[in-house]
Structures are given as C-alpha cells and as structure tokens.
Regions:
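Strongly charged
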Residues: 1-200
C-alpha cells in the first residue's frame, strides 16, 4: 500500500497541541491556551532545531539532541576526527551518521546498539537557550525545551506503534515503517560544493 504524502511535522504538531489543550482544560484555574499560539511555538521550535542541526553538520561538527539522538560524521580512510581541525585545507572523506540515544530507545522499546567512537566527530549538545535566542523570534528556553520534548515523545510513540513516518530534519529524513526506523541523509544538504560526502 503506497503511503500518502503527509506533512508529518504538521501532523505531530496538531497531536501535541491537542494534548496540551486537553491537559490545560483539566487544570482548575489554568489560563486557557490558544491553539494557534501553541502550534506556532511547536513549529518555530522544530524549525529552529532543523536550522541548528544543519549548521552544525555543515561546520563538520556533530550535534546531540538530549534524550533523542545524535547526528555526526564518521571520518573515513586513514584520517582521524582531529584531522578536520589540523588539516582544514584537505578534503577529508566523511560519512554522516545518526544514532538514537539509549534512553530514547529504552523509553520506546526500540533496539539500541553502540557505535564505535574512534572515527566519529565529537558532538555538541543542544543548548536550548542558544537555540531560543538565535533561531526563534520570541520563544524562551523553556518553551523550546518543552516543545521539542513533546515532539520527540510523539515521534517515539509513532515509531513504537508501528506507524509509517517520514519526518524531515533539514539534513535528511527519519523514516519509520512497521516500527523499524532509519535515517536517510540528504547529501545535497550536507555539503558545500568543494566537499566530498560519501553516501550511507
């Protein structure tokens, strides 16, 4: 059965907004939430994450999203990750790598296995304050943190439930079918013209 073209990010946003509105109506004395404002927070946080992630990978650095996973580079051949700084003029062959975090896999009953670290570029942890300040118009650190936490949880729920999912991360797509996720990097979004990226 062919899957329809669905904007999965928008679908996840709609679900999370619905959950937030239900939770707010259950609380006594809580101010009512606006569907449009909650959706805007989630969309803007998601787009900020995509922009940050792409910037890190274009700079040949790894990016770690706490509680979700990491996106990094594997250095190929006889090179080492330190060669990226030591020999910046040299074209060093790289392969993009994605790995879910062990916590994410445990929470959603997904298999997890470690990856050999010796050829991987070190990852920078996502800083929610910097993400909010640099990549959003008015969101606070707490707004971005809670938005991404809720979206990550919903992604995990979808994968664990066996739903088909294709979600654009700005550097490629997270694809899940029948509870089996994989990440498909888009080489055109990961390189500048003078660089060489080896496909997965």
């Amino acid at each position: 059965m062919a899957s329809q073209q669905i904007d999965w990010a928008e679908d996840l946003v709609t679900e999370v907004v619905g959950e937030r509105l239900k939770a707010a109506t259950r609380k006594r004395g809580a101010e009512p939430l606006s569907h449009a404002i909650e959706a805007k927070k989630l969309r803007e946080s998601w787009e900020a994450l995509r922009v940050w992630l792409r910037a890190k990978l274009l700079a040949k650095r790894g990016a770690s999203i706490p509680g979700f996973g990491r996106f990094t580079w594997q250095v190929l051949g006889d090179y080492r990750p330190s060669d990226l700084q030591d020999r910046p003029e040299e074209l060093i062959p790289l392969r993009p790598v994605f790995q879910f975090s062990e916590d994410f896999c445990k929470a959603h009953l997904l298999p997890w296995r470690p990856i050999s670290e010796d050829k991987l570029v070190e990852c920078a942890d996502l800083n929610y304050s910097i993400l909010a300040l640099r990549h959003t118009s008015r969101l606070t650190k707490d707004m971005v943190w809670s938005a991404l936490r809720d979206l990550q949880r919903k992604i995990g729920d979808r994968i664990a439930s066996g739903y088909s999912l294709t979600l654009d991360f700005g550097v490629g797509q997270l694809v899940a079918e029948r509870g089996k996720p994989r990440f498909c990097f888009d080489a055109s979004k990961l390189r500048r013209e003078e660089e060489q990226v080896v496909p997965q």
